Amino acid sequence: MPQTVSFTRMKDGTKEDYALIYAAERRHAEGLVDRVLDALRALRPKEGEGMPLQVDRMEHCLQCATRAYRDGAGEEMVVAALLHDIGDELAPYNHCELGAAVLRPYVSERTYWIVKYHGIFQAHYYAKHVGLDPDARERYRSSPHYADCVEFCEKWDQESFDPGYQSLPLEFFEPMVRRIFAREPFMSDRAVAESAADA
């Protein structure tokens, strides 16, 4: 049986308890890339399921990443393009935020922002057909990342629903994903700053 902590309330935990927890968290984090790639694979629909698109959502992500790669985007952005929709299965109404949250500790503020807001920017292409505002992205025009998000959607995201496009396989991108997620997570300073701002 695995070793467990002594407490039933966190405030009663000891230094040894928290050392045990942190060691387990480090071991768990080692499998993160495999879980992220599994989440991407889960975008392949089961028989009789899926969206009525000409490609499934995993293929859409592969096309988006392939286009970014072939356009000479940096590795971080290629990985973001690959993973931008991984939240679709668990968070269909806020998938952008979930995907961005997964990437956030490992990517720049720019990349995080693009993934977080790409859904609003992507709506520019279809909103008028479903009774939404196609210019909703304009509320973010003052962001230093606005033009980059427009470009992400225009060149890669909205283009990537083509059954005739020759995308690269997931195996091509896996080493890139592993390198990005091997970075030292730099969320702590950002999290502290945001907690202070929210207080």
Residue ranges and their predicted role:
Residues M1-L82, I86-A199:
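Metal-dependent phosphohydrolase cores
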